[in-house]
Amino acid sequence: MIIKHLHLINYRNYKKIDIELSSGLNIFIGNNAQGKSNILESIFVLAFTKSYINVKDQYLINTDGKFALLRADCVSSTVENKLEIIVSEKSKKLKINGDEIKKYSDYISNIKVLIFSPYNVNFVKVGPNTRKSLNMVISQFSDSYVKMLQNYNAVLKKRNQFLKSIDCFKEYNRFYFDALNERFCALAIEVVLERNKFITEINKVLCNIYEEITGYKNLYLKYSCNIEFSEIKDTMLEKFKLKTKSFFDREKACGMTLLGPHRDDFLFLLDGKELSIFGSQGQIRAAILAL
C-alpha cells in the first residue's frame, strides 16, 4: 500500500500542508529547518502511531495549535484506506476510513514503513532501543505479534506489581502468582518463537545485502534470549516455568521480573565481533541499511 496524498494540520512546524505523492520516488528538497524531516516523521507516525524519535506526543503539536491532525490517503491494488491520527496533549485518536479504532493492533500494519535516519544508529546498541525497533518491524508483518506482545506486556505489568507488593514477613497469595506465572510463561514462549522466526528469515538474506552495499560478508543478527530453545514447544514452556520458579526469591527481593522477552538482546555481529563495540560508524549505518 502506498500513500498518494498527505494532509497535516498543526504538525510540528506546519500549520497546514497538503502533499500529492507519486507511486515512484518522491524527493523533498529545501533549506535546513524547513520541515523536510517532519514530513517523513509524519508518515512514520501514521504507520506506527508514534515518532521514531523518542519524544512525547505533545511535542508533535505545533506551538500555536491545541491538536495535530495527520491524514493519509493510501491505495493498493485491491483497497483504498484513509488513515487519520488526531493528537492532543492528553489523548490520541486513531481512525480508518472515518471509523475510530480503539485497539493499536487493529490500526498498525496498514502501511509498511522503513526509515533510515541518524537516530537509527541507536538500533545496534544493546537494550530497549533495539527491542523497540525490532518490535515495530515485526509488527508490520504480523498482526498476531502485536496482540501477543500487548498481552505479554499486560501480564508482565501485573506480575511486577505482585512482586513489588509482596511483604517478606507476611503470607501472600501464591496460588494467584502461580496462575499469573502460567500465563506469563505461555505468552513469553509465543513472543520469543515469533521473534526467532523473524530473525531466522532476516539472516537468510542479510549477509548478501550487506555484501552488495559494502563488499564485505559475514554480517549476522544474533538473538540473545534467556529462554532455552527446543524443537518442541511444550518442552520450552516446561523448562521456562522451572527457570522462573528458581528465580522467584531473587525476583521477590528486587520486586521485578528478571526473565522473559522484555530482557532479550539483539546483536549485530560482523565477522563474529559485536558491531556496536568494534564497528565503525560507516559499518553500523550500512548494517542498518541492509536490515
PLM segments and residue spans:
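A conserved P-loop NTPase coupling/switch region
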Residues: 106-113, 117-186
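Nucleotide-state sensing region of NTPase/ATPase domains
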Residues: 48-130, 135, 142-145, 203-208, ...
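Helix-to-loop junction immediately C-terminal to a conserved catalytic motif
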Residues: 44
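Conserved NTPase motor "head" modules and their coupling/switch loops across ABC/AAA+ ATPases, GTPases
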Residues: 1-31, 171-291
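Conserved lysine of the Walker
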Residues: 36
